[in-house]
């Protein structure tokens, strides 16, 4: 999307304002896609700052944190997984857009026009509304979106719970804009539209007064994330809630919202979170008789079944009582601290990988990605208290030492190398003993 040096042109002020769509057209006008800064990457420090700020404010106002550690780790893990494809290729949304622009555009609006800027703002938001709506109303699209709704908490970390598959369905809805809007303008607004949706994932902000009429707000988006019957298939807006008001999908927040999927998945394992609904579709597709019914399994709503309306029956959605207890890990606090520590180590190498992709060999890049995936899976197993978690963690720590020894994982601070070797050696010994104990006792065979 951009040239390597472009992100350095984004100031701290711009990075923060981009998250609230408070940028001037004149400061975000670029002639080519390569000039467009990576606003999302530049916003990473603000993500962290606002998550911590929300945590502090929640402690002050409610006397408790805004979420749970296990759920937050799973949400951030989903965000980590969703970014991995970008190590190899540009976003499909932008790639497909550029292709249509270069081959099929009908006219060319000026890239430096204020009118083009605002028209693109409306066009991208309108496209997002219809993508988001279809992501809830078409089962195969829902499989590429449901990961975002799987959290039973609602806080800023939930915003990071993104699907690795979503961009492979969303690109279609922006293609009409490519007939006349330059890719550089689109590349700016597709990022701003995403960034705006970060801060609305919070319970701290109750209402924004008159702005509730026009903008998508935390209150409106809380409804969207609810599994109460009145919340289902409502408030699809990205930035402007007017689309929901126009097309009849608006619902105001009027009772306690219970968050998550209508049928909670009960796991913190990141790839189960990402792909469990695809497995459900696969099973349902092959067990449903008739070509027409099989077609409906894919392209009607997630709640559809033979003899039911396209989006299913609302009375089949489980009632909520307000007493629902979110799925939580039974792991000890010490083990949770351990998972946070291992996650932090992984995240440091993850960010360093993105910063230095151009100078890393393909072998190193692939080995690192495998390590990242294994780390997130192992953390999920530990939080789920799976019987094979100790064995997986033993192998993961051994893999780290191997990659470290052969130079595929080098800490930014060279003096930490010895500390890492000691720490991971101790981890191998601990988890290795646990694995042997489980193997000899027979508990390893349990799920």
From Swiss-Prot:
GO terms for cellular component: endoplasmic reticulum; endoplasmic reticulum membrane. It is found in: Endoplasmic reticulum membrane. A motif (Histidine box-3) lies at residues 221-225. Highly expressed in lever and small intestine. Its cofactor is Fe cation. A motif (Histidine box-1) lies at residues 132-136. InterPro entries: AGMP_C, Fatty_acid_hydroxylase, Sterol_desaturase/TMEM195. The chain crosses the membrane at residues 43-63, 111-131, 170-190, 340-360, 363-383, 413-433. Glyceryl-ether monooxygenase that cleaves the O-alkyl bond of ether lipids. Ether lipids are essential components of brain membranes. This is Alkylglycerol monooxygenase. The gene is Agmo.
């Amino acid at each position: 999307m951009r040239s390597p040096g472009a992100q350095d042109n984004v100031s701290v002020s711009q990075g923060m304002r981009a998250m609230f769509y408070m940028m001037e057209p004149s400061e975000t006008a670029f002639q080519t896609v390569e000039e467009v800064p990576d606003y999302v990457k530049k916003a990473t420090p603000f993500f962290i700052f606002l998550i911590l700020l929300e945590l502090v404010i929640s402690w002050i106002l409610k006397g408790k944190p805004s979420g749970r550690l296990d759920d937050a780790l799973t949400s951030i893990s989903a965000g980590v997984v969703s970014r991995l494809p970008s190590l190899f290729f540009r976003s499909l949304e932008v790639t497909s857009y550029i292709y249509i622009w270069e081959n099929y555009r009908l006219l060319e609006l000026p890239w430096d026009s204020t009118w083009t800027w605002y028209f693109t703002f409306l066009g991208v938001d309108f496209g997002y509304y219809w993508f988001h709506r279809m992501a809830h109303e078409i089962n195969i699209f829902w499989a590429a979106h449901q990961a975002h709704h799987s959290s039973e908490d609602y806080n800023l970390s939930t915003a990071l719970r993104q699907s690795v598959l979503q961009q492979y369905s969303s690109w279609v809805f922006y293609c009409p804009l490519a007939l006349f809007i330059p890719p550089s303008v689109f590349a700016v607004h597709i990022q701003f539209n995403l960034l705006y949706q970060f801060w609305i994932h919070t319970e701290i902000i109750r209402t924004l007064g008159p702005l509730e009429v026009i903008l998508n707000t935390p209150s409106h988006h809380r409804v969207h994330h609810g599994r109460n019957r009145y919340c289902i298939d409502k408030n699809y807006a990205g930035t402007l809630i007017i689309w929901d008001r126009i097309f009849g999908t608006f619902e105001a927040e009027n009772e306690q919202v219970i968050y998550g999927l209508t049928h909670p998945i009960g796991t913190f394992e990141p790839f189960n979170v990402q792909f469990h609904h695809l497995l459900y579709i696969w099973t349902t597709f092959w067990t449903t008789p008739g070509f027409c019914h099989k077609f409906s399994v894919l392209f009607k709503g997630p709640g559809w079944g033979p003899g039911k309306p396209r989006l299913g029956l609302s009375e089949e959605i489980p009632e909520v009582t307000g007493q629902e207890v979110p799925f939580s890990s039974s792991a000890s606090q010490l083990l949770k601290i351990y998972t946070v520590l291992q996650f932090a180590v992984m995240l440091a190498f993850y960010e360093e990988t993105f910063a230095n992709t151009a100078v890393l060999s393909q072998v190193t890049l692939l080995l690192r990605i495998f390590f990242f995936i294994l780390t997130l899976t192992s953390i999920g197993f530990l939080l789920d208290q799976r019987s094979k978690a100790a064995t997986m963690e033993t192998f993961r720590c051994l893999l780290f030492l191997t990659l470290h020894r052969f130079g595929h994982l080098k800490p930014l601070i060279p003096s930490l190398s010895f500390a890492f070797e000691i720490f991971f050696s101790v981890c191998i010994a601990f988890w290795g003993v646990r694995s042997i104990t489980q193997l000899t006792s027979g508990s390893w065979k349990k799920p």
